[in-house]
Amino acid sequence: MNGEQQLDADAGSGMEEVELSWEDYLEETGSTAVPYGSFKHVDTRLQNGFAPGMKLEVAVRTDPETYWVATVITTCEQLLLLRYDGYGEDRRADFWCDIRKADLYPIGWCEQNKKTLEAPEGIRDKVSDWDEFLRQTLIGACSPPVPLLEGLRNGRNPLDLIAPGSRLECQAFQDSLSTWIVTVVENIGGRLKLRYEGLESSDNYEHWLYYLDPFLHHVGWAAQQGYELQPPSAIRHLKNEAEWQEILAKVKEEEEEPLPSYLFKDKQVIGIHTFSVNMKLEAVDPWSPFGISPATVVKVFDEKYFLVEMDDLRPENHARRSFVCHADSPGIFPVQWSLKNGLHISPPPGYPSQDFDWADYLKQCGAEAAPQRCFPPLISEHEFKENMKLEAVNPILPEEVCVATITAVRGSYLWLQLEGSKKPIPECIVSVESMDIFPLGWCETNGHPLSTPRRARVYKQRKIAVVQPEKQVPSSRTVHEGLRNQELNSTESVMINGKYCCPKIYFNHRCFSGPYLNKGRIAELPQCVGPGNCVLVLREVLTLLINAAYKPSRVLRELQLDKDSVWHGCGEVLKAKYKGKSYRATVEIVKTADRVTEFCRQTCIKLECCPNLFGPRMVLDKCSENCSVLTKTKYTHYYGKKKNKRIGRPPGGHSNLACALKKASKRRKRRKNVFVHKKKRSSASVDNTPAGSPQGSGGEDEDDPDEGDDDSLSEGSTSEQQDELQEESEMSEKKSCSSSPTQSEISTSLPPDRQRRKRELRTFSFSDDENKPPSPKEIRIEVAERLHLDSNPLKWSVADVVRFIRSTDCAPLARIFLDQEIDGQALLLLTLPTVQECMDLKLGPAIKLCHHIERIKFAFYEQFAN
């Protein structure tokens, strides 16, 4: 099953992809959005074309048949705040109106349409001669254009006037100042897809510009500025001169009404530059904005425009990249700007060294550096900061807009990492005033496609997916392929689904279940839980585990919130029922996906079961911890909580496990502690239990004569316990790897009652005192023959040591050797005290491990000492 099928299966089981939630995405990534007001070009687009001070003829509110002059006080999208002329500074009569619904007309409309122009009642007595008042107040007045009012009345935004098919004039910004007609193919929120007049869509010369781009103008601009209309050099070769002139003549004959010039009133005003030919500077190549390189002013067109060429020291036959600039063009810097800002400057192609030096380069070229005064002042006050999110145009694929993260800010320039791009690209450099960047949500608002990172895709959770195990056994090939894909994909799913989205948590019921959990009940659990929110998924997992325990209240106590916790997660109240009593305790659960794997592992260790019993990884036929060699009677050798140097709880640090049935009056005298809990803190936990809680480990211990760490050790064996004993006996029979019978093998030949008695005695010998040496039978080594080594252990690597440990019955300890990077030399130096201290092992496992180390030492002296 491939990755796509896996994703589809997930969606079908309870997850469906929905629109991107920016609030959730920002929370997951730990970032913030760039403030909306930082994008001036977008803010301008939202203006309705009106400006404070404009005058209109407006219907009088108390008498709709009459009209009067009103002044625009302020604007807010489609709303205007108006004040009738004559009220002066009195704001009490100000009123709001909706442009699309109100009767608003330009000055002179009433006279043309023979409508009554009369002052409202509230001010009629203030002025004696209203005709003279109007003549004075309308001197120099500005009124909105008629097309604007008509368009707004029809529900159209001013920007909507730039409709597909509209014509504009576009300057060639690559190598010359030639201007040519372009046709609007698409307008998405002011971002225009343009096609040169005379070309078809199949010619692949369409390009994107924002409508306020300084190189885009209304039709007639070239004639006003004295520029000739001619196709840019990039497309000139596609037709001969006669064909281009024919196209131009056809456009002029059609005489379409040009787009109103007021649409471009907010365009940047081009100032006068002071650059001269042969000046050197630093520049960002607009066609490849991924670095800063040396460049040269190669041509000055006029007082407003000049041509910059990226330096290239290779032979002349290489194509040169140039672009037209003006005084305020972004992406050009004075010499040494990169050095002053701690940035790397890329040497020009053909430069003999990777270490570029401006002084040597200027001397070599015989050129001068452009003085600082030629460059516009940098914008120091802006709201762009590192790790903020925005939307940005992909400079390689201009039709694509991606989510972007600001990775660096230098003055008024940003380094952006685009996420979710069809083709991965390096960080690109843009100005804070670039018209190719937009606030988060711009694409969604304007219907523009947005490329989002995979981990940002939000899935709506119908319910936490619980996959039940199949009753029908599939073919072995299908099973193995499916499991392999799940194992490969499980580690990636944490990042794919976001910071707070937990991957599937698998219950690997074939793994060692430890002393608290019933193997039979675990086998009945769902195959997996999730994916979904970390807290919800892990809460469900822990609830299922608690219910699969011999004593749910005991497992709940093991899982309860610890004051020394390092997870910094959230506390969730979980419940357990045992023998008619309800218990609840606060359990800490991690909130982020990156901690799920370790949380599951540590929880398994806390419950003294195989670290792979549950987690994001599905175990195949063989567990990596080699837990199949373990039985319930041996759990103390391998897994257990490791509370370093902590004897009992601190004062007041009692268990937070509370019983729903408070029976303080029935509190009995606690019996002598014959069976001390294996956890060091348990005795203190008993002493400090609140009066309202059941005594001992939450209350159930007082009622049971079989008080031990494990309900399976009780006198009255239940059906689950018998099943457990039978499973362990079968496991021991399959194991049989030694010439002499092992302790577990001997137990299989005994009657069930003998087995139970034997199990109790053996386990009690460990839970009585964890530092008490085990009996000789208990530490009996299954493989006692002399060890023969194929290589010198002094030269073993960490991997060699781990490989050897995994081959023994101490396989679960191999991870410690890997984590502590114990190689062959370190292995030969280990002794029982150092093993106990450094590896934090109990005496039983430490003795068993040291036995294997002694075997290695003996073989070393015998085979390699000479």
Curated annotation (Swiss-Prot):
Keywords: Chromatin regulator, Differentiation, Nucleus, Phosphoprotein, Repeat, Repressor, Spermatogenesis, Transcription, Transcription regulation. Its main location: nucleus. Pfam families: MBT, SAM_1, SLED. One of its GO terms (biological process) is negative regulation of DNA-templated transcription. Residues 796-864 form the SAM domain. GO terms for cellular component: nucleoplasm; nucleus. Residues 34-42 are annotated as: Antigenic epitope. PANTHER family: POLYCOMB GROUP PROTEIN (PTHR12247), SCM-LIKE WITH FOUR MBT DOMAINS PROTEIN 1 (PTHR12247:SF77). This is Scm-like with four MBT domains protein 1. It comes from Homo sapiens (Human).
